[in-house]
């Protein structure tokens, strides 16, 4: 029964639409009606600016972390339960009950779960992600590249079967949630964040 209750709470925490809340309350903008329509960090960054984007990213990470920490903080259960409970937060973020069972792509919330389970692994994953975002200026490409790399690290360096399994599942889920991005990447129409080497290359090309 405890696990069922924690799964429900984790889903409800994960379902909190950070981007919608920040957009409506502080910018009088419904992020779902602007840019790509996604409620996550990247679209918030593009539409509302870096401050709003950073706040939404932190909120989405914390959603995953707080939800996943329930077993260890409240019931002193094995740390491995954090990954199980955390998956419910990802479902909440992706299919939010508060906004008609729609949501974001769960990259930041997934990172939050990793933080709850293994902070060192979270830092490694974050460093890889930031490096890829800086190199490509495309969060979608960075996400779809970082997760497979992180999965390999879990398998071969940490040799943690549960972490490896969850990382692999998250990789598949991230690719599934980025279907529209993959189509835009193939067509050369994927938007860049105004940051990093990819953005600079595009700016130089536009000036020629």
UniProtKB/Swiss-Prot annotation:
<comment type="pathway">
    <text>Lipid metabolism; phospholipid metabolism.</text>
</comment>
<feature type="transmembrane region" description="Helical">
    <location>
        <begin position="155"/>
        <end position="175"/>
    </location>
</feature>
<keyword id="KW-0444">Lipid biosynthesis</keyword>
<feature type="transmembrane region" description="Helical">
    <location>
        <begin position="113"/>
        <end position="133"/>
    </location>
</feature>
<keyword id="KW-0812">Transmembrane</keyword>
<feature type="transmembrane region" description="Helical">
    <location>
        <begin position="81"/>
        <end position="101"/>
    </location>
</feature>
<dbReference type="GO" id="GO:0005886">
    <property type="term" value="C:plasma membrane"/>
</dbReference>
<comment type="function">
    <text>Catalyzes the transfer of an acyl group from acyl-phosphate (acyl-PO(4)) to glycerol-3-phosphate (G3P) to form lysophosphatidic acid (LPA). This enzyme utilizes acyl-phosphate as fatty acyl donor, but not acyl-CoA or acyl-ACP.</text>
</comment>
<comment type="similarity">
    <text>Belongs to the PlsY family.</text>
</comment>
<dbReference type="Pfam" id="PF02660">
    <property type="entry name" value="G3P_acyltransf"/>
</dbReference>
<protein>
    <recommendedName>
        <fullName>Glycerol-3-phosphate acyltransferase</fullName>
        <ecNumber>2.3.1.275</ecNumber>
    </recommendedName>
</protein>
<feature type="transmembrane region" description="Helical">
    <location>
        <begin position="55"/>
        <end position="75"/>
    </location>
</feature>
<keyword id="KW-0594">Phospholipid biosynthesis</keyword>
<dbReference type="GO" id="GO:0043772">
    <property type="term" value="F:acyl-phosphate glycerol-3-phosphate acyltransferase activity"/>
</dbReference>
<keyword id="KW-0443">Lipid metabolism</keyword>
<dbReference type="GO" id="GO:0008654">
    <property type="term" value="P:phospholipid biosynthetic process"/>
</dbReference>
<feature type="transmembrane region" description="Helical">
    <location>
        <begin position="3"/>
        <end position="23"/>
    </location>
</feature>
<comment type="subunit">
    <text>Probably interacts with PlsX.</text>
</comment>
<keyword id="KW-1003">Cell membrane</keyword>
<keyword id="KW-1208">Phospholipid metabolism</keyword>
<keyword id="KW-0472">Membrane</keyword>
<dbReference type="InterPro" id="IPR003811">
    <property type="entry name" value="G3P_acylTferase_PlsY"/>
</dbReference>
<keyword id="KW-0808">Transferase</keyword>
<keyword id="KW-1133">Transmembrane helix</keyword>
